[in-house]
Amino acid sequence: MPEDSYIPQAKNDGAFQDLKRRRANDGHTEFSRRDRVHDVQPASIYSNVKENKPAWMRSADENKDKKYDQYGSRVDNGTLQQSLGVAKQVPTASASTTTVSAKVESFSAEKAINTANPPPPSTTTTPSSTTSSSSSFPSSSSLYLKYGNIGLGGRGTDPRMDRVKRNREQLEQSLSIREHLAVEENVNDEGSQPKGDGEVNPYLHLDVANPSVIHTQRDEAHYRTFHSKISDRENRDINSIVRQHYNERTQQSKRQGRRTMSPIYKLRNFNNTIKYILLGNWAKYSSAEGNAPKIFSVLDLCCGKGGDLNKCEFIEIDQYIGIDISDLSVREAFSRYSKQKARFKSHSGARTANKYNFEACFATGDCFTETVPDILEPNFPGIIDQAFPVDAVSIQFALHYAFETEEKVRALLVNVAKSLRVGGTFIGTIPSSDFIRSKIVEKNILKDENGKFKFGNSLYSATFDKEPPADGVFRPAFGNRYTYWLKDAVDNVPEYVVPFETLRALCEEYNMTLRYKKNFIDVFNQEIPKYFSKLNKSLVEGLKRSDGKYGAEGEEKEAVAFYVAFVFEKVT
């Protein structure tokens, strides 16, 4: 059988029973805690924040600082003193994340628009502790102000809100006008100036409810490939670019068209399969010792829009914690989880198919410059005591952003090492430094029309501003920047080379030992026979090649070979 493909073989169904996740304890298999205990209470920490007064308004707890000790002592200027044998200080980026008050103000502004000139939103209001009074309810006309100025006379004068049935001629004329305006809007969008971070609007292109307008399926016939509108990339910091890029990605994904029409649909399926395999093989529950939480928990750093939520259900976790720098991505992840969680309700205590059976919480933050408690505790008081240490920390397609500086990498590894239990795993995917070196040594990197050095194909490319070293070994190991482009996914975003031996050496400083490292092609070829019958049918069909076999081919194969998977285990 060729190494770059897979043909499924018929096997006894009983051979795949071991694919069901079981929790290991001293080498013996056990069933899920939820299978054994039917009256178990939810692992969510949401119940702990339903108080009349927000967490940041309550009196300080004399033991509060103890929960931060394991992540390093804090000093007056806001920097963190790293532990675990590292004597460096990592500055906290003041503008890298959304503060608690800013998030509360944003939430209040969206949810509490009462009049044409509303008062400033209160910074003491949170989604979990919002209070209402009779005077705070908006009038019937002001309810529509948040959708824009529909008419001078309120809802009664807006022809779009009429419930009177229009005749066929009027309807066809209305549809014709809408199509004409849509074309003009697309032209204007392409020629408009890019917006800054503060101008990104998460509510663009929402249709006002109008039963008189028939929504045709013309949009499904055309797929709009993602393009970002980030200006002045050369002079902006990496955090600002990454945040705006993924905010725009979240916005545009809702109006691109059917996902199956994406030019990288098969490539995405391949990458998702790799992540299923990694989490399925390496994210394991272990019986808790002492006061550690007796739940199977995963910390997902740089969680994005929650693309790995299905994978966490696949391995049957109990608690999910997601952190990302993009506030719109975090909002989308929470929305995705909430909708799926509410689809089916189970009162038996057993896991239910087609729904998320785990509890989850999400937060906006930069895990490269802030500690995990600083990100989570303001919104989820007590979570560090209740849900940590975790069984696995996952960071997918994001760690390379930290290699801008050594300080950022060390800050990330402090968060990982301090969040993991002993025996827990650090699971991730990064660009392969070996792949980049091979492109350089084999002279497959060319100078483009702008004098920059580039390799890739029609699906992906990596562009260096200056000529890389002839031997492909970057010195020093940090700050080696290139611009990465992946069609319909990553639109010329700065990334940094991750010399793997440097990552390995740093992880060993934080008591994490390498257990697994393979490029994506090898992971797929070696593991897919075990997982083929377990994965979702549509995901598997998305892996089918033009010759009927399964795997990556052509330019897709080169694009996925750009990445490598790794697993580190915390030993002490």
From Swiss-Prot:
Biased composition (Low complexity): 123-140
Residues the UniProt record annotates as site (mRNA cap binding): 305, 311, 336, 400, 495, 563
Catalytic activity: a 5'-end (5'-triphosphoguanosine)-ribonucleoside in mRNA + S-adenosyl-L-methionine = a 5'-end (N(7)-methyl 5'-triphosphoguanosine)-ribonucleoside in mRNA + S-adenosyl-L-homocysteine
Gene Ontology CC, one term: nucleus
Residue ranges with Basic and acidic residues bias: 24-39, 59-69
Binding residue positions for S-adenosyl-L-methionine: 275, 302, 324, 366, 396, 401
Principal localisation: nucleus
A GO molecular function held by the record: mRNA 5'-cap (guanine-N7-)-methyltransferase activity
EC category name: transferase
Region annotated Disordered, chain positions: 1-75, 110-140
Signal peptide: none
EC number: 2.1.1.56
Keywords: Methyltransferase, mRNA capping, mRNA processing, Nucleus, RNA-binding, S-adenosyl-L-methionine, Transferase
Binding residue positions for mRNA: 271-272
Domain mRNA cap 0 methyltransferase: 262-571
Compartments in which it is found: Nucleus
Protein family: Belongs to the class I-like SAM-binding methyltransferase superfamily. mRNA cap 0 methyltransferase family.
Function: Responsible for methylating the 5'-cap structure of mRNAs.
Name of the protein: mRNA cap guanine-N(7) methyltransferase
Organism: Lodderomyces elongisporus (strain ATCC 11503 / CBS 2605 / JCM 1781 / NBRC 1676 / NRRL YB-4239)
